[in-house]
């Protein structure tokens, strides 16, 4: 029983903690040794002693020793009874202590597991601190970018306002120029209409003059074309011969044949048809020259008329083209002004949207940061509580020291961390209560 108790795990808990059975073992060992020595002495006495001489004394001594031994046995019996009671009590205490030991070991294991979990949470929160630091830096960068974006937005709005004012001034100037061009074109149109009307009247007058001239030309041609010089000369000669002057010259020749001037007079009278023919021919040539001159003038007038018509047509085309160009330029300016205004409004709206998005992102980052700070504070306080609650010695895992140069933040891990935090902050979906059946 002593050996089985020696092999119990309670005897091995420590060198300093001594149980009841440890002392009882030495007690029984000393008792057994004393009994062995007594028996050995008796045997030696019986073998080597004088039995007959010392029987009475030995008997008395034996009685005395027996009485002593009886008293010792009685005392040892009482001590054994007491020790049995104490042993029973110690067994109960041992069972209680063993139960407490098992409970303590379970508690130690639980505390170790909690401590390991706290160490893992500590490592996790150290990593979370890196993410939080990255989020804080990102928040600062977002704030700086928001400030820069606000400055850029204000500068762009100012530039767009100046550009809109410049465009409005240019539109006003272009409208004034278009109005001046329109007025000049209207004046040119009225002048061209007046010139066209005058040209129409001149053309009608020229047509009438041309008709009259053509009629006169036809008459003159009808009169001049049949004129034959030889026939005209023969007719004039016949008329001359049939005239009274010719006959009178013939009769005078008989009476005044001795006069010296008569022959010259006769030659003059005879050459009179030729002179008349020459004069008529000169008149015909002059008439032909006049007809040719009138024809040339008519051709020149026709050419001027065609040039004037072409000039009028060109003026009309130029006026139409100028009006079309002015209208197209005005339409283009209006379209460009509307487009620039629309672009300015779109850029302004885009900048406002971007600024609102940056503000929303900044607010979300602030909320995430506050939530993370709160969660980290809670976890750190829980970790401190776990560390303080660990009272028994245990092999504590060595905390890894912070690396001198932390690795860079992975954007994917950072986004996953943000998503996990946002999902943890979502309100749980509450299922509607199902009414009990029956």
From Swiss-Prot:
Its localization reads:
Cell membrane; Membrane, Caveola; Cytoplasm, Perinuclear region
Q: Does the keyword Manganese apply?
A: no
InterPro entries in the cross-refs: PV-1 (IPR009538)
Coiled coil regions, renumbered to chain: 289-383
Q: Which residues are glycosylated?
A: 82, 88, 112, 150
Supply one GO BP term.
MAPK cascade
Extracellular compartment spans: 48-438
Q: What is its main location?
A: membrane
Found, by tissue, as follows: Expressed in lung (alveolar endothelial and bronchial epithelial cells), kidney (endothelium of peritubular capillaries), spleen, liver, adrenal (endothelial cells of the zona reticularis of the cortex and chromaffin cells in the medulla), pancreas (islets of Langerhans), testis (germ cells, interstitial cells in neonatal testis and spermatids), ovary (stromal endothelial, thecal layer of developing follicles, luteal cells within the corpus luteum), intestine (endothelium of capillaries of the intestinal villi) and pituitary (pituicyte cells in the neural lobe) (at protein level).
- The organism sits in which domain of life? Eukaryota
Listed under GO cellular component are:
caveola; cell surface; perinuclear region of cytoplasm
Q: Does the keyword Transmembrane helix apply?
A: yes
Which interval of the chain is the signal sequence?
none
Residue ranges with Pro residues bias: 399-410, 429-438
Provide Cytoplasmic-side residue ranges.
1-26
This protein's membrane topology, according to the annotation, is:
Single-pass type II membrane protein
GO molecular function list: identical protein binding
Q: A Pfam family in this protein?
A: PV-1
Q: Which residues cross the membrane?
A: 27-47
Could you give the subunit structure recorded for this chain?
A: Homodimer.
- Briefly, what is this protein's role? Endothelial cell-specific membrane protein involved in the formation of the diaphragms that bridge endothelial fenestrae. It is also required for the formation of stomata of caveolae and transendothelial channels. Functions in microvascular permeability, endothelial fenestrae contributing to the passage of water and solutes and regulating transcellular versus paracellular flow in different organs. Plays a specific role in embryonic development.
Q: What is this protein called?
A: Plasmalemma vesicle-associated protein
Organism listed in the record: Rattus norvegicus (Rat)
Its ancestry begins with: Eukaryota, Metazoa, Chordata, Craniata, Vertebrata
